[in-house]
């Protein structure tokens, strides 16, 4: 096991409560690091809300230790919540070891995600691997998976090293 990702949390109503989560993630990340495992957090749309006047996602990035906690940015939910992943890459460089790559249906299906620009900034983000998910199926699952894999494998902006 190389990576462990926390897939969800309910967003607390106070920063004090959110800090408890961040401290917990730091401790888990420290224990994982001692075993050679990277620990990260995966966002959804609900992290892009204000808690006591501060964006929860930013608060989490600011209150977790980069050495112990990385972020698997869900590009779809970041964009769908009217945020720009590039702003996060620039503000928190190196924190996004995994990209959760998805679109409304198969990858590239909506043409609204801007994957070319996102992947062209992957080095700033700290990307090690993209992880593909399909949000909604319009075809059989295996066909969707193949179409998404074909899209990434053919995309000139996706480094060959990610195509393992």
Please describe what each predicted stretch is.
Residues 1-71, 162:
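Active-site acidic/histidine proton-transfer and metal-coordination neighborhood
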Residues 51-73, 77-164:
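Histidine-acidic metal/acid-base catalytic patches
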């Amino acid at each position: 096991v190389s990576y462990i990702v926390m897939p969800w949390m309910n967003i607390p109503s106070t920063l004090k409560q959110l800090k408890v989560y961040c401290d917990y993630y730091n401790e888990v990340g420290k224990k994982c690091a001692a075993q050679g495992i990277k620990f990260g957090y995966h966002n959804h749309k609900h992290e892009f809300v204000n808690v006591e006047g501060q964006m929860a996602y930013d608060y989490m990035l600011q209150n977790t230790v980069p050495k112990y906690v990385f972020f698997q940015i869900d590009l779809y939910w970041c964009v769908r919540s009217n945020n720009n992943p590039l702003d996060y890459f620039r503000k928190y460089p190196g924190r996004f070891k995994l990209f959760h790559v998805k679109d409304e249906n198969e990858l590239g299906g909506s043409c609204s995600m801007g994957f070319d620009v996102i992947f062209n900034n992957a080095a700033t983000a700290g990307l090690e691997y993209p992880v593909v998910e399909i949000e909604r199926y319009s075809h059989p699952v295996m066909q969707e998976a193949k179409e998404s894999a074909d899209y990434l494998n053919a995309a000139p902006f996706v480094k060959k090293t990610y195509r393992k």
